[in-house]
Each structure stands twice: as C-alpha cells, then as structure tokens.
Amino acid sequence: YLCKQEILFNIMNMNRHCRIIKCILSGVVCALLLPVSMQAQKNTAFIPGQVWNDTDGNPINAHGGGLLYHNGTYYWYGEYKKGKTILPDWATWECYRTDVTGVGCYSSKDLLNWKFEGIVLPAVKDDPNHDLHPSKVLERPKVIFNKKTGKFVMWAHVESADYSKACAGVAVADSPVGPFVYQGSFRPNNAMSRDQTVFVDDDGRAYQFYSSENNETMYISLLTDDYLKPSGRFTRNFVKESREAPAVFKYNGKYYMLSSGCTGWDPNVAEIAVADSIMGTWKTIGNPCTGPDADKTFYAQSTYVQPVIGKKDAYIAMFDRWKKKDLEDSRYVWLPVLAVSYTHLTLPTI
C-alpha cells in the first residue's frame, strides 16, 4: 500500500486556495453564507503567509502550536511571542529568541474566526530558575484531553536559553482555556526532548513524538493513562536522519507523520512517513511537496495536522513561516490535506 498512498496539499492558485479552504469548511463555516454586510468582522478565508487577525482585529499569536477539538469548539494553543527578537551575544548559531511570554489560546467554531482566550500558561517572572522564566525557551505546546481524568494536559518543549536543557514540560487544567498549572519538566525516557507533539489514538492511548539524541532521532513514547508522564515504552525512529517538527494524524487506519529537517529557523525539505501501528515500523515516503519552493516546504515548517470534524477525510495541515529576526511576525500556512493517489504538495509562490 505504501506506494499508492497520497498526502496531497493541492493549491493551483491563490483564489482557488481560498475556495478549497471554504469548501473543506463548508457546513462548518456558517459565516460564509451570510451577506457581506453581516460578516464585516468575520474572516471568510485564510490566505497562507498573510496576517491572520483574531476577532478583536489583532494578529493571531500562536506559533509552533496545535489544535484541540472539544465540545463543539476548536482551541488553538501556541507560543505567544511578544517583544524584540534578539540574537544573544554568546550565540554560536542563529538562536534568535524572544523572552518567554507564555502559551496563548484562541477558540473558534469554524476554524477561520478565532477569539483570544488569553495566556493560559504564563511566564513566571519572579524566579530566574523556573522553566517558564522569560529568559528561558518555551516551544511547541500541544494540548490533549484525558477522558478518564477530565483533565486537559499540555506538553511542550522547555529549554535553557542555550538549548542545553532539552526537556519536556507538562501542565494541567480543568478547562480548555486554563489556567494551566505547571507540573515540571524532565527528559522522557532519559532522553533529550526538543521539537515535539502529542497524539491521542482512537483507543484513548496517548503518545509523545519528540526529536532526541541531539535532534538526530525521533522518539515515540507511550504515555501513562493520565497522560502526565512516559509509560516506559518507547521506540527510536529515523535514527541519524535529523527530523524535527513532527505532526501526526491517522487516515484509513494508517498513521502518518509529517516532519522537517533540522536547519534552525531556516526552511528545508519536508518528509512524510507512514506506519501500520504507532509503535511499529515507520516507512518514509519522501517529500510530499512539488512545485515552486518544494524543497523549502514553501518557506514553512510543520507543526500540526487537524481533522475537520464533521467532514469526511478532511484535514488541515498547519505550518509556521518563521521570521527569525522578527519572530512575533512569523506567519501561518494552513493547507488542506486530500488523500487520493499520489504523494505531492503543490502551492504557488506567495
């Protein structure tokens, strides 16, 4: 089956892209059916790489993030980047950074119009040793819901300023809009944990996917039933292949992982891998992108893939277009995922 699988992000031109997004969300995006005069404050389409405003008219600030669907509402969590982007004097590589502000949260019924719910996991300003102090690094927050405990569990990559800590941080909340209470950090399975995501399978089991061993190997770790720590069962994948920014989804009983190479803030080639089981053997299909700038993933990096609830076989792949010298102004590239017959991704130059 591997050679016949396709992950298609098919965009022929910008106007058609808007129509595809509208089509995927039709039946979800009621605003698209309203007269123009009634939707003056609403977004009716998303253009990749352009500023995307929330319902207050401010640019959405949720970088490196992911979505959670709960009780009819989508929640978007991401790095809330504010303030000046700097390159530390001691830096030996382009580790541009902003001070940690926290994890921002937005809510939406239609995936187009997002209400800012606030900073649900804020920085801890009065303790320089805390993982969430502004001087540290907080990246790739993802939230999952535990049906057994009724808790919302956030996993994130937490770091020292020089990226030597390489830990996972966990926080818990009773509500999807927080506040999240920080539980601490650790190296899952005694291994480095940097770019990461979490995924809940149909049976309720949750997994963390994380770049480890100095970003050379992708670990997949089964979590405990409460989703708060590793169970001790894990696999090592893509050894010495240096993959990061994992985004995982399930289609037709198979598991897919979208990832990027490791080139700091600079874009690189994407890869799709597929497996029959999460803890089984992963087979790399190759670069899903075709067309202009395919070898740069259209100047973006994967972060999450979200099923569109209520739409059969409809998925949206989320990417960040990083601006390394102005990280707050990094933009979003969302693309529809269609599963048909070939493996490619097409998008015009933006």
Where does each model-flagged region fall?
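Bacterial Sec-dependent N-terminal signal peptides
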Residues: Y1-Q41
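Beta-propeller blade signature
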Residues: V103-S108, G169-S175, I272-S277, W334-A339
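Beta-propeller domains
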Residues: G78-K115
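Hydrophobic core segments of beta-strands in well-ordered, beta-rich domains
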Residues: H63-W90, E117-V120, L132-P134, E139-A161, ...
